[in-house]
């Protein structure tokens, strides 16, 4: 981004996108065939172009601060998905696929493949990785978390919300709230439920409120396919815990994480009381923003 600031010392007053080039004989770096370079650069170009656009809109055009890392990276991964969506529309099933079981055409692979892997790894460790608080520039699990959140958000509010998130001087959670017209706590709570409720086994998909599922992508279906492609054993790795009445569930939860628990019981048996506390058995401080979302499962 410094190249975009003409007043910066040492600036060449140009916008440059740096990428790898084919080097099959490893003359200047590790070996990169032409096919490898093309495959890797496609999604990376869309990803980095979003960063350039975001910096221009936030800093240069509006004089604000650069977008928060978690949201900036999440939007760049959404930009990668645009490449997949282009080829998905160009090659509807079963066209453009090496095998009839493929969910996506071959040409979409370089764009959607890494996103699905990131998402799977996040779901496999959702208690350890935050949606909104990155460790540095973000692990692949954290990036998977933010992509899933923004994908769900766009399904709820329309794809144009990504434009509103970029064309503004707002950043972070305040940006999400302004663009969506909702409190972040409400969005995060329903997103947490959607991760579990989307395409719930044994329940018709349209029996789940649209707010508690993704749009036309079945999360469990695409994660099950990702498990096959990447050699994982669990078709849907999101952990759920049993919390029968009278039981205690303990867990460490960094900011921006969630835990999913199923409370079995007979509705005719009367109400169930839930109590939450810190590890010291004291109430949560209000600044922590601890919250609970409840979904009654169909019988």
Residue ranges of predicted features:
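Stable alpha-helical elements in mature extracytoplasmic
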Residues: 37, 41, 45-49, 71-75, ...
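Hydrophobic transmembrane alpha-helix bundles
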Residues: 2-24, 97-104, 164, 195-222
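Generic structural hydrophobic/aromatic packing signal, biased to beta-strands
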Residues: 19, 47, 76, 150, ...
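Juxtacatalytic substrate-recognition/specificity segment
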Residues: 1-68, 75, 79, 83-98
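Beta/coil-rich, acidic/histidine-enriched accessory regions frequently appended to metallopeptidases
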Residues: 171-299
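Generic preference for hydrophobic/aromatic residues in regular secondary structure cores
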Residues: 3-4, 10-20, 25-28, 117-123, ...
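Structured segments of extracytoplasmic/periplasmic soluble domains
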Residues: 52-56, 79-86, 152-160, 164, ...
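Acidic/His/Gly-enriched intrinsically disordered linker/tail segments
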Residues: 64-146, 173-198
